[in-house]
Every structure is written in C-alpha cells, then in structure tokens.
Amino acid sequence: FTADKVQFDVDFVIHLAAIADVRRSLKEPELYWKTNVEYSKKIFDLCYKNNIPVVYASSSCVHAWWKSPYGTSKKAMEAIAHPGQIGLRFTTVFGEGARDTMLMSRIRNGTVKFATEHIRDLIFVEDIVSAIMIFVNTGTKNKNTTYEVGTGQGTKVSDIVKHAGYNVPTQEGQDAEADDNTANNSELRKLGWKPTLTAKEWIDIRIAVDYTNRLGEPK
C-alpha cells in the first residue's frame, strides 16, 4: 500500500482487511503488526488527509489486548485512528464465509472435537453489516470513536456445542483467548441497531434445512 493520494471519488471507506486468528498471531506476531497496524495507518492517514470518513473492524479482543499479538494489533489500530474514524469491536462472528477454524463453521462441517467453558457473544454476519451501514448512512461525525458490536448475550462454548447435538469432551482453552467477550452494545442500540439472529437460532435453522435437504435426496 503506497498511495499518497486518492485516485477516485470516494465517499466512505469500510476497512475490514486484516489477518485474524488469535492462535496464529502467537506464532507470527510481526506479520500481524505489519498487516493490521502499519498498513491500517496508511489507510487512516490517507483518508484523514482527504476528509474521507472511515469505519474499521476492531475486535472485542481489545479488552484483553495483552493476551495476544492479534489483540495488541487491534488495540493499536484504535490508538492510531483519527477523528471521524470509528472502530467497531466485533465479538465472535458467524455466518456464511466464516473461516473453517471458527466454532460455528466446525459445528456445521461436523469437525467439533472438543468444547471449552469460554463464554462467547456470537454475532451473525448480517447483523455486522447492518451495524456498518448505520455509519455509512448517517456519517461518523458527533459519534463515539468505538462501538461494541455483539448481541450482548454470552453463552458457554460447551452449551453451544451441546445445542448442536455434539457430545464431546470439555478442555481448557488457551490463555491467549479471552474468557468472556460479551459485548456492551448499549451505545450502538442508541443509534437504532439491534441483533436479529442468535447462534442457537442459526443452528436450529441449519439443522432444519439439512434435514429437509436429506428428505429430498433420492433413495
């Protein structure tokens, strides 16, 4: 990323590019810093120079940023963002396109081997989109610098796994992972946003759809 001026007419920037995965960040901390922080700074500086508002993906990991290079990189992004650039602290996102290593992807793909007692606020990807669109439609002026984007309801990973019908052992989670990432979404709700689908509802829908599809398969 070497641009020092905007080549096109740009009204708004939605910056979601980053390397995710807390566990991987423990092995490649320099890559996470360069990609998530240094490259983001170029975007932030360029947009600020050209008066372009920005919404960017932060993370609930900032609440325990010291536990991992990933969390550190997201905390640093918030520190270097300029006025008019808003960080959305996503909790644990699920839905189409999620990484195969994510909990809900493992549930859908049948690759769950164990569960933990971590508490996760699982947020549907379409609810993430609706949160972003609030700022696209209303702008970033006179708003907070960060907002937490989650349902506001945390559930144990082991309970989610059981709800999906898996009987797997419970193990200790990694120290690098937050014990509880439940969001305080009160500020975002003041702007008219609210979540529409819980993780358990999504699981029930997937089970029903998969069952219906199996009924339609030739015998």
Predicted regions mapped to residue ranges:
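A recurrent short beta-strand within the Rossmann-like NAD(P)-dependent oxidoreductase core
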Residues: 92-93, 113, 117, 132, ...
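Glycine-rich NAD(P)-binding loop of the Rossmann-fold in SDR/ketoreductase-type enzymes
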Residues: 12, 31-42, 68, 72-73, ...
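Amphipathic terminal alpha-helices
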Residues: 198-219
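NAD(P)-dependent short-chain dehydrogenase/reductase
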Residues: 69-71, 75, 79-129, 133, ...
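C-terminal "lid/loop" region of Rossmann-like NAD(P)-dependent oxidoreductases
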Residues: 144-147, 155-185
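Active-site segment of SDR-like NAD(P)-dependent oxidoreductases
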Residues: 20-23, 59-67, 91-94
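Conserved Rossmann-fold NAD(P)-dependent oxidoreductase catalytic core, especially the SDR/UDP-sugar
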Residues: 15, 38-71, 86
